[in-house]
């Protein structure tokens, strides 16, 4: 049986995280052959995004939020990269992976980027990461537990203040 090939751009300033994501995804139950392109900072990610033809669009982009910036191109974080990816590769599924658990940051990400997935790194195990990937692959939105709880709490506080 031929496996479907998908191409994933993985952006994280910790190479071990990228290796971990790749290892976990190799156990997917979807019959997918996964090809990855790594980037370790905003500059390398920008260069990959800008030189990849639209016809060779990435199927997924896993983007860490906190990355060394590329100030020459006004790319300050993973948020800027995610917006760049979203604008160029309109069918690419964006998954934001972050250590930030602050409700206002998470809410801002959802409002500004509207990613297909938003996961707080301390929330997920290998199994949950794989589940998130499979759900997103099947056109569902996935948010990890901390995202759901903290944004709900923020919205409760905001509605109380209104």
Residue ranges and their predicted role:
Residues 57-60, 87-93:
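His-Asp phosphorelay/catalytic-motif detector in bacterial-type signaling
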Residues 38-60, 70:
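Acidic, metal-coordinating helix/loop segments flanking the phosphotransfer/catalytic sites
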Residues 5-25:
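Conserved acidic segment of CheY-like receiver
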Residues 66-72:
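The short loop immediately C-terminal to the conserved phospho-acceptor aspartate in CheY-like receiver
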Residues 72-91, 108-111:
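Short amphipathic alpha-helix used as the core "switch/output" element in two-component signaling
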Residues 107-111, 115-117, 123-162:
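Short, flexible helix-to-coil linker/hinge segments that flank and couple to helix-turn-helix
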Residues 100-103:
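Short, conserved "switch-loop" micro-motifs in signal-transduction and mechanochemical regulators
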């Amino acid at each position: 049986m031929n496996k479907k090939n998908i191409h994933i751009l993985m952006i994280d300033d910790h190479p071990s995280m990228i290796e971990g994501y790749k290892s976990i995804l190799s156990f997917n139950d979807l019959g997918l052959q996964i090809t990855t392109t790594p980037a370790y900072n905003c500059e390398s990610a920008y260069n990959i995004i800008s030189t990849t033809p639209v016809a060779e669009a990435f199927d997924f982009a896993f983007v860490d939020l906190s990355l060394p910036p590329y100030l020459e191109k006004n790319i300050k974080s993973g948020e800027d990269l995610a917006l760049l990816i979203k604008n160029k590769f309109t069918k690419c599924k964006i998954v934001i992976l972050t250590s930030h658990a602050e409700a206002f940051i998470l809410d801002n990400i959802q409002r500004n980027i509207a990613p297909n997935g938003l996961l707080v790194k301390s929330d997920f195990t290998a199994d949950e990461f794989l589940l998130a990937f499979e759900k997103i692959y099947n056109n569902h939105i996935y948010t990890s537990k901390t995202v759901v709880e903290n944004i709900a709490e923020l919205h409760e506080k905001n509605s109380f203040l209104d």
